[in-house]
Each structure stands twice: as C-alpha cells, then as structure tokens.
C-alpha cells in the first residue's frame, strides 16, 4: 500500500512516498526536500508560487518513486491551536464493563462538541479509570462500580486548514488525512520506549517551536509557539548590524548557549551594513552568544509555560528529546 506524506514548512516543502507492507518496516520509495521562501508564519505570501513549488515537489516525488500520486497525508501546523482535556464518568453498579458502557460515556461527554471557526484535528480516549485505578488499555472485561474516560481533543483554526486544503484542491490531489506537524516530527525521532515510558519532544524549527508529550504510547499533548531559529538569526543581524546571510553563518559556526572564558578572546570578522560597500568589523564570540542566549531562554520558557498551563509538568516526565535545525545549536542539549 502506497502512502504519501507532505509537509509545507516555513523554509521547505517535504514529500515522502512509502510502501507500507504487513509485518515489515515501511519501504521509502522517495524523499524530497525543496526550499521555499513563500511562506511566513504558516501564511502563503504568494499562493501561485507556493502552488507551483508544491506541484514541482509532487512531480519529483512521483517520478522518483515511479508512482502516481493522487492522495496525500498532510501535516498541519498547530500554532494557535486549542487543547482540551475532559472526562466522562458513569456508574455501572459492579457490573461487567462492556462496549455499550464505553459508548454511553462517550455520548454523554463533550466528544462531539466543537468551537466556532475551529476544526477537530485529534479527539480520542487518552486513558480510563476503573474504580479510580488508571488504565491505558481497553477496560472491557473488568467488573467495576465507576468507569471514567479521560479524553484529549486538539483543535485548529478552520481557515488555516482550508488554506492548506485549497492548495491541493487546485492541484486535484485528495487530502486523505490531516496530521499535526509536531506528531509527525516526534514519531520520526522517538522510539517505542520513549513513547511508552514518557517523553517530551521539542522541535526547534525555523519559524516555530513545537512540542508533544507522549506516555504509555499515546499522544497526551501537542502545541507550538511562534518563535524559531529564524528569530535568533534576525536578532544577531540586528544586534551587530550585519547581513542575514552573515548572521546565519555566525549562528551556525560560532553560536552557543553556553559561555566560555575564551569567548571574549575569540575574534571574528563580519561584514557590516550596508553590505554593498564591502566594509568589515571585528567582534568577539561572546557578543554573538549574548544575543543568542536570551532568545533561547524565551523560547524554552514559552514551552515550559505551555506544559504548566495544562498541568503536564506534574507528570514529571524526565526524558526530553530535541529535534529540528535549532537543536544543532551548540550547548542547547545541556542548557
């Protein structure tokens, strides 16, 4: 069975074609990354240009995999999303738990409720409580007096989803399934033990930083903040009056969130604005890192606030996994 996944990010468009077979690992038939500058904070700057780029990526992927692409699974960013944790309790008077009881609990819950201008992206039972004992598997077959279902619902703005869907409607490609972008990112880097024992995965992207929380092989939470590695690049460019190209190079080659006594003595020559005059000046490495550190602190603090907002910090999950381009910043794993 052929499956196609597409991710339209703020710096690149990605497409993967895979062959899913029973009792074996997926076989990757094609993987395409294509740079784009036509998206800013998940909004299309030029619809026609981004449509042409996506068409080009799909064509390359189809040619590379020797398949005809008619439908896709599409990643959807979750910046400005809303998460709901809710439950539903029923009394079954020491009877055997049956599917009928689960359906009753679902029907009397907020499972089918939605907010105006939002679309439900994920909505499922995260755990069960049988007489106050938490279960993560199906409780059918147990005797109990009280059954409680704990749900998680993730909603994204309809306009965002319709914008992305409309792109593929014009290309006459069917969107088979919508997938939260942080979930795709986490599944690519977390192993079975990570997902089972508990893990927080933070994806430090170019224009946003997303996070997911896994435990007992279930997604407990997904969200994102609108700050990414591009903000660090812009901070450097403004802070030392250099070009964006130079700032990106400085961040990659010299950037760190950890200070060292030698930073004061490591001198770097950089072009200054306006760049067309070809003028240069010298700065030390600590100047760059003093710009980087506050932005990284702000980003991680916003992520921490998201966890506290939904009381997820109380789960005391210790396993933290970093991914994305920003995770390559020196010292961030030890910060």
Feature map (PLM): residue ranges:
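Short loop/turn elements that form and flank the Walker-type P-loop nucleotide-binding site
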Residues: 195, 207, 315-317
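A conserved active-site cap/scaffold subdomain adjacent to cofactor or substrate pockets
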Residues: 226-248
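Glycine-rich phosphate-binding loops at beta-strand->alpha-helix junctions
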Residues: 258, 315-335
């Amino acid at each position: 069975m052929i499956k196609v996944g597409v991710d339209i990010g703020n710096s690149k468009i990605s497409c993967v074609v895979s062959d899913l077979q029973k009792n074996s690992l997926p076989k990757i038939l094609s993987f395409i990354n294509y740079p784009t500058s036509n998206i800013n904070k998940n909004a299309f700057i030029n619809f026609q240009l981004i449509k042409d780029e996506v068409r080009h990526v799909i064509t390359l992927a189809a040619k590379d995999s020797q398949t005809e692409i008619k439908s896709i699974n599409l990643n959807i960013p979750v910046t400005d999303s809303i998460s709901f944790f809710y439950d539903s309790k029923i009394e079954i008077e020491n009877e055997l738990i049956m599917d009928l009881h689960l359906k009753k609990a679902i029907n009397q819950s907020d499972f089918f409720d939605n907010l105006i201008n939002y679309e439900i992206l994920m909505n499922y039972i995260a755990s069960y409580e049988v007489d106050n004992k938490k279960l993560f598997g199906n409780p059918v077959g147990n005797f109990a007096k009280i059954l409680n279902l704990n749900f998680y619902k993730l909603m994204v703005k309809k306009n965002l989803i319709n914008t992305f869907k409309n792109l593929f409607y014009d290309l006459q490609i069917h969107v088979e399934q919508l997938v939260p972008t942080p979930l795709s990112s986490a599944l690519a880097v977390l192993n079975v033990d990570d997902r089972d024992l508990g893990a927080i995965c933070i994806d430090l992207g170019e224009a946003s930083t997303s996070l997911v929380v896994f435990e007992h092989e279930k997604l407990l939470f997904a969200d994102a903040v609108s700050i990414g590695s591009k903000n660090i690049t812009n901070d450097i460019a403004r802070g030392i009056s250099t070009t964006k190209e130079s700032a990106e190079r400085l961040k990659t080659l010299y950037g760190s969130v950890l200070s060292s006594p030698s930073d004061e003595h490591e001198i770097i020559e950089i072009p200054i604005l306006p760049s067309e005059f070809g003028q240069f000046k010298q700065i030390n490495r600590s100047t760059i890192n003093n710009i980087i550190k506050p932005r990284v602190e702000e980003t991680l603090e916003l992520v921490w606030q998201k966890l506290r907002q939904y009381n997820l910090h109380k789960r005391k999950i210790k396993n933290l996994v970093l991914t994305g381009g920003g995770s390559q910043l020196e010292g961030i794993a030890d910060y």
